[in-house]
Amino acid sequence: AFVINDSCVSCGACAGECPVSAITQGDTQFVIDADTCIDCGNCANVCPVGAPNQE
């Protein structure tokens, strides 16, 4: 699964690209639900700061 690191700027680009809606707005940044994530990598491909990383 992918996780979003602290470089997240909460732009929301990743959430719009997730085909399974695994990405939601958290308190300070976006969060990926590891149980829902299908490891497609769309979030990492569109993130302007490279915050999503595969675990």
UniProtKB/Swiss-Prot annotation:
Where is [4Fe-4S] cluster 2 annotated to bind? C18, C37, C40, C43
Q: How is the cofactor bound?
A: Binds 2 [4Fe-4S] clusters.
Q: Which residues form the 4Fe-4S ferredoxin-type domain?
A: 2-27, 28-55
Keywords noted in UniProt = 4Fe-4S, Electron transport, Iron, Iron-sulfur, Metal-binding, Repeat, Transport
Q: What cofactor does its activity depend on?
A: [4Fe-4S] cluster
Q: Does the keyword Repeat apply?
A: yes
Pfam families in the cross-refs? Fer4_7
- Gene3D superfamilies from the entry? 3.30.70.20
Annotated positions binding [4Fe-4S] cluster 1:
C8, C11, C14, C47
Q: Does the keyword Electron transport apply?
A: yes
**Cellular component GO terms held in the UniProt record:** cytoplasm
Q: Which InterPro entries match?
A: 4Fe4S_Fe-S-bd (IPR017896), 4Fe4S_Fe_S_CS (IPR017900), 7Fe_ferredoxin (IPR000813), PSI_iron-sulfur_center (IPR050157)
Q: Which GO terms describe its molecular function?
A: 4 iron, 4 sulfur cluster binding; electron transfer activity; metal ion binding
Main role? Ferredoxins are iron-sulfur proteins that transfer electrons in a wide variety of metabolic reactions.
Q: What protein is this chain from?
A: Ferredoxin
Q: Which organism is it from?
A: Clostridium butyricum
